[in-house]
Amino acid sequence: MNEKITPWIEGKRVLLLGFGREGQSTYHVIKQAGGYACLDIADMASPAQRPDEEARWITGPGYQKCMDDYDVVFKSPGIVLEKPIEEYRCQILSQTEVFFQCFRDQIIGITGTKGKSTVTSLLYHILKNAGMDTMILGNIGIPALDHMEEVKPDTKIVFELSCHQLEYMTVSPHIGILVNIHEEHLDHYKTMEKYVEAKQRIFRNQKKDDILICNVQCLPESAICPSTLLKAGVNEPDTELCVAEEPDGTWIHFRDKAYRIPVDEIRLLGQHNYFDIGVVYGVCSILGMDDGAFTAGLKTYEPLPHRLQYLGERDGVKYYDDSISTICDTTIQALKTLKDTDTVLIGGMDRGIDYRELIEYLSECQVRHIILMEATGKRIYQEIYKFYPEFKDRPRLILAEHLEDGVRRAMEITRPG
C-alpha cells in the first residue's frame, strides 16, 4: 500500500481537511506510509482526543484559511470550500480521487439521488455469490484507502459515490451507473445545476471504451458523455435496458436477452427496486454472468434497512420503515407499493426542495391519516393551508410535535389490517 500512496505525499506538506471517519482513515494511511514533510489537521471542531501531538491542529471558523500553506490537502466529502477550487495554490485531493487514479479500470461506480446504496449492495452481493473476487467501498461506509492493499488485478470494485465524493473528481470509473437525479442537497449546492454537475462527474472523465448505464430521466447531452451510453428505463422500449411490466410478469430486456424478475421470491418491493435490479442485471450481463447465477444471488439478497423495511405487526397493524425516503419521488413510490397504507408519517430535516409533487399526490391518494412532523412536515402543512385550497379532505392532516408524538398518534388511529 505504501508505494501506492507515496507519490502523493513524499516530501510534501500535507493537510487533512476534516477529521471525521474518512479524515481519520486518511490520517492512519498516510502516517503508516511516512515520507511526508508534515501532516497537519484542520477541522471546524476540536477533537475529543488528538491522535498525534506532533501534528498541528487548526480549528474554528477560519480553519480553511491555512490551506495554501500546504502542498497537498486531502479534503473530506461534504466540506464546502470557501472559494472555487482553481483559486487554491495547493493540490486538493480526496480518498476517492487517489483510489480511482490507482484502480479506475477495475471500478464499477454507482451514483444517484436515491437507489445507489441498493444498487451497490445488490451488485456486490450477486457478484460475490457467483464466486467473483469483489470489493465494496465508498459512500456505503467503507473508506477506500483502508483497503488498497487488498485489490488484486482481477478484483471487481463496486464503489458507491455520493455527490460530495464526485464534486471535484478528475477521473471516472470504467463502468458508471447513474441511477437517477432528483432535487436534493440544495442546502449544500444552492442550485440544481450545481448538484447535477457534481453527479455527472461519474462519466465526465470516462474514456471511449468505458460504459455509462444511465436512467433516461437524466440523460446527459451526447457532447459531454465520452463513453458508450446505455439508456435504461421503466416501460421505455427505445432503451438498451428496459424494465417492463408485462401480462406475465416484470421483465428485464437488455441487448438480446430477456429475464423475468422472480418478484414473489425476493424481498425487494416496488417498481423503483425492479429498476435497480434491472441495472444490476445489465452490469452482470456485461461481466459475463449467466441468468442462473444472477437469480441465485438475487433470491438471497437481504435489503438494506430503512428502505420499505418491514418492522413487524402489532394489534393487527403492519409497520414499515422507509425513512431513507427524503425526496418526493421515493415517498410516492413507497405509497404506491404499499397500497393499503392507512397512516403515513412524513417529516424530518428540510433540505430546501420543492414538495409540490408530493402534496399533489397526497391530495389524490387514499391514505386516511397523514401525520406531519419536524421541519419538513411543518413546512408541508403550512404550504397546503396557504397555497392548496383544493387539497382534498384536509381533516386527514395531523400536525405532530415530533417523531415520538407522531408514532403515538399513528398507533391510536390506524385501523387493523
Question: Could you describe each region identified by the protein language model?
Answer:
Residues 37-44, 212-216, 345-346, 366-375:
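Short internal beta-strands
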Residues 43, 60-61, 93-98, 226-246, ...:
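Beta-strand->loop->alpha-helix junctions that form or flank phosphate-binding loops
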Residues 1-109, 130, 299, 307-309, ...:
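Short, basic phosphate-binding NTP loop
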Residues 28-31, 64-70, 77-216, 220-228, ...:
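Phosphate-binding loop of NTP-binding sites
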Residues 45-51, 65-66, 79-84, 218-223, ...:
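Short, charged/polar "capping" segments at the starts of alpha-helices
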Residues 5-13, 23-29, 133, 261-368:
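Nucleotide phosphate-binding/pyrophosphate-handling subdomain across enzymes
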Residues 50, 357-416:
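C-terminal helical cap/extension that packs against the catalytic core
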Residues 34, 172, 202-208, 224-225, ...:
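Short, conserved loop/helix-junction motifs that constitute active-site signature segments
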